[in-house]
A protein has these predicted regions:
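Short, solvent-exposed turn/loop segments enriched in Gly/Ser/Thr/Pro and often Arg
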Residues: 148-151, 202-203, 347-356, 410-416
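Short glycine-biased active-site loop of nucleotidyltransferases that positions the nucleotide triphosphate
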Residues: 135, 213-217, 357-361, 414-415
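Serine-hydrolase-like catalytic core of hydrolytic proteins
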Residues: 77-254, 305-327, 337-342
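Non-catalytic accessory segments of hydrolases
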Residues: 1-169, 193, 380-391, 400-411, ...
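C-terminal lobe and pocket-closing loops
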Residues: 338, 356-360, 382-385, 431-452
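Substrate-gating cap/lid region and adjacent catalytic-acid/histidine neighborhood
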Residues: 223, 230-238, 254, 258-385, ...
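C-terminal domain-tail junction helix/linker
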Residues: 413-440
């Protein structure tokens, strides 16, 4: 079978996927960018683009890929990255596509565009928990992306603002460029450019939050999913870019750079070392790698945008796990966000993953949403397989129509002022039910989080 397709950029060749009848197109360059410059979209290539292997990941702290570098990250390293090999570079603006092998232009399949988490400092678009999502077997096109991380993606300096008219938010400009590339090219993979659902977890969910608040992303997507982050989040309310200048000036000084040209030419390892040394200083708490009001991607703070009712009015799914980072806070965020938007649905995941570290901790639901349980070392049972299949059905139904409900699925009700229950996914049969916020608060205060 040929995996060649003709896109507006040129001919591209993919490869078979672990799922029968599914084709994968890996490492597609969607843009190029100089350090702390806006991404330039890729619109053409010569010859046949080889999309049979993943592209490099964004340079990131060793804690994300070296087990010995940071014991505090060992849990997540063992869960999601152990045994994997990644390449790290400053040339990393790649995306990946999975689609039915027989999908043709004009099929107009719904598209799920996934943004990975990692605290805006780590991760990539082909970690093993979403390497080969099952969604195309349900008639959806899957897309994952890389974007700029850490100091690569968030530096704010007056010299950069003078140069380009704005500074900061480079990570989000990458996500915007990837969305624009998908809109322009996804029909060649059988996808519907007018039916794109953006989805993210943790920092990826916070990215979704920023995308639905931005005035320059309208028309690029029609639905949104936020897992363990995002919503009406005071944790990530964008500050003016100027508020971050002292932090990044200190990083620049710590790196021994006196000019922007020197800072741009600094080796990545030295840049990340300087950033790491400064971010732990108490006077810079709450500054660094986060969204800013730059006058371009974001022109208002999140609360200002919501007060003006200028967020995207589209269907939303939003939820969290029972042992998440700050579950009571995420609970309130989910309720507040859904109450502001019609056709919004919230979930609560409490499945205790099997193993010697049982729990429904932050990120534990990813294996289920992507249908990639087989990639994990854990002794999953038939119950886990059935739960994952159910969650995938809800998600792909939502991507298709904006309503997660379907035949043979327990009814998932929208959130309203009168209906505040969550869809409970996990230990009990799936059902609508309340969440004991006091129990979540007790757990957060008394039970150590994984990795601690």
């Amino acid at each position: 079978m040929s995996f060649e397709r003709t896109t507006p950029c040129g001919v591209i060749s993919g490869t078979a996927c672990q799922w029968p009848g599914i084709a994968a197109y890996k490492g597609i360059r969607y843009a190029t960018a100089g350090r702390w410059e806006s991404p330039i979209p890729v619109t053409h290539w010569d010859g046949v683009y080889d999309a049979t292997r993943y592209g490099a990941c964004c340079y990131q702290p060793r804690a994300f890929y070296d087990e010995a570098a940071a014991p505090g990250k060992a849990f997540y390293y063992n869960e999601f990255r152990k045994g994997e090999t990644y390449t790290y570079s400053e040339d990393y603006l790649f995306l990946n596509i999975w689609t039915p092998a027989d999908a043709a232009p004009g099929d107009r399949l719904p598209v799920i565009f996934y943004i990975h988490g990692g605290g805006f400092t780590g991760g990539c678009g082909h970690e093993k928990h979403f390497d080969g999502p099952v969604w195309p077997t349900k008639g959806c096109v899957a897309v994952t992306i890389n974007y700029r991380l850490g100091p690569m993606g968030f530096v704010c300096l007056p010299a950069l603002a003078d140069e380009a008219g704005s500074t900061g938010n480079y990570a989000f400009l990458d996500q915007l460029a990837a969305l624009q590339w998908v809109r322009a090219n996804i029909a060649a993979f059988g996808g519907d450019a007018n039916n794109i659902t953006i989805m993210g977890q943790s920092a990826g969910a916070m990215s979704v939050q920023q995308l639905v608040l931005s005035p320059i992303t309208r028309g690029l997507f029609s639905k949104a999913v936020m897992s363990s982050g995002g919503g009406v989040s005071q944790m990530l309310t964008a500050k003016p870019a100027e508020a971050h200048y002292p932090f990044w000036k200190q990083v620049m000084e710590t790196a021994g750079c006196s000019t922007l040209a020197e800072f741009r030419a600094l080796a990545p390892a030295r840049l990340f070392a300087a950033w790491d040394a400064v971010r732990t200083q108490p006077q810079f708490k709450g500054l660094g790698c986060e969204p800013v009001v730059d006058g371009r991607f974001q022109v208002k703070t999140g609360p200002e945008t919501l007060a003006a009712d200028e967020q995207h009015h589209i269907p939303y799914l939003i939820g969290f796990t029972s042992e998440d980072i700050v579950p009571p806070y995420l609970y309130q965020m989910a309720q507040d966000w859904c109450a502001r938007n019609a056709d919004s649905y919230s979930w609560f995941f409490d499945r205790q993953l099997p193993g010697d570290d049982r729990g429904a901790w932050h990120s534990s639901d990813l294996w289920y949403w992507f249908g990639t349980l087989a990639h994990c070392w854990r002794p999953f049972t038939e119950k886990d397989t059935a739960l994952s299949a159910q969650m995938v059905d809800y998600l792909t139904n939502f991507a298709r129509t904006g309503d997660p409900n379907g035949a043979d699925l327990p009814q998932w009700q929208t959130v309203t002022a009168q209906q505040t229950d969550f869809l409970r996914l996990g230990e009990e049969p799936t059902h609508m039910g309340s969440v004991d916020v006091q129990k979540l608060l007790w757990t957060m205060q008394n039970v150590p989080a994984v990795g601690e």
